[in-house]
Regions:
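Residue-level signature of beta-propeller blades and closely related beta-rich strand-turn architectures
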Residues: 54, 122-124, 178-180
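Hydrophobic beta-strand positions that form the internal "hydrophobic ladder"
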Residues: 48-49, 116-118, 172
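Structural signature of eukaryotic scaffold interfaces centered on beta-propeller domains
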Residues: 30-45, 99-113, 165-169, 178
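Loop-centered beta-sheet repeat module
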Residues: 1-61
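C-terminal structured domain segments
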Residues: 138-180
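Surface-exposed loop and turn segments in beta-propeller and other repeat-based domains
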Residues: 11-34, 68-99, 153-159, 167-168
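Loop/turn-rich, solvent-exposed surfaces of beta-rich toroidal or solenoidal domains
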Residues: 97-145
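Beta-propeller blade signature
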Residues: 1-11, 55-59, 131-149, 186-200
């Protein structure tokens, strides 16, 4: 999963972390049938936390050798598991097929509140290649420092640009520069700040 380079010695190599075995099950390099290798990760200063696009769980490693899996499945998505992509068919068709499947996007660590944000993209029949697909809805799964799900919020399409976001002292900022948003202005970069709301027990 990761490569390393020692800038003092010039040594380079690969870490011992590997994709889950399910990703190697039916790959066929001869006939170009491969899994989507998309990976997102964040670092807490102690652990590297890994999210795969077609995998419900996240993986945590403190030594780049051993990993522990934690459930991070969206309640809005069906079970996500690796689907083979056929490299012999049209790229656009492959993208449309993938767009209909449960999929996880980026993973972010909030050092101020010690939580993680995992973005889940809702399946959509109208995914277009080379587009941000502004109509697509998404959700954000929130996990605590022990990698337990503590909440999830769903966001509508045509409102936010989920790929434009960052963590600040006040909360999670998500851009409203969605081209389908009625308030969209290409001359202004607008973000909305979202904060955690804890329910009283």
């Amino acid at each position: 999963m990761f490569a390393f380079a020692n800038l003092n010695t010039g040594e380079t190599g690969w870490s011992e972390l590997r994709y889950p075995l399910i990703f190697n099950k039916d790959e066929d390099f001869k006939n170009v049938k491969l899994y989507d290798p998309e990976i997102c990760y964040t670092y807490t200063g102690k652990d590297v936390v890994i999210s795969l696009g077609q995998y419900d769980s996240i993986m945590v490693s403190s030594d780049f050798k051993h990993k522990i899996s934690y459930n991070a499945k969206s309640r809005y998505l069906a079970h996500a598991y690796p689907h083979l992509q056929d490299g012999q068919i049209d790229l656009f068709k492959n993208i449309q097929i993938q767009g209909k499947l449960p999929h996880y996007s980026h993973l972010m660590y909030d050092k101020y509140r010690k939580v993680f944000y995992r973005f889940a993209l809702m399946p959509d029949d109208n995914i277009k290649p080379f587009s941000n697909n502004p109509h697509q809805s998404f959700s954000i799964i929130i996990l605590n420092k022990d990698y337990e799900i503590i909440g999830e919020t769903k966001f509508p399409g045509n409102t936010y640009a989920h790929h434009l976001c960052f963590v600040g002292k006040k909360g999670l900022y998500i851009s409203e520069n969605n081209e389908n948003n009625p308030q969209f202005d290409e001359n202004r970069l607008v973000f909305r700040c979202f904060t955690l709301q804890y329910r009283k027990k």
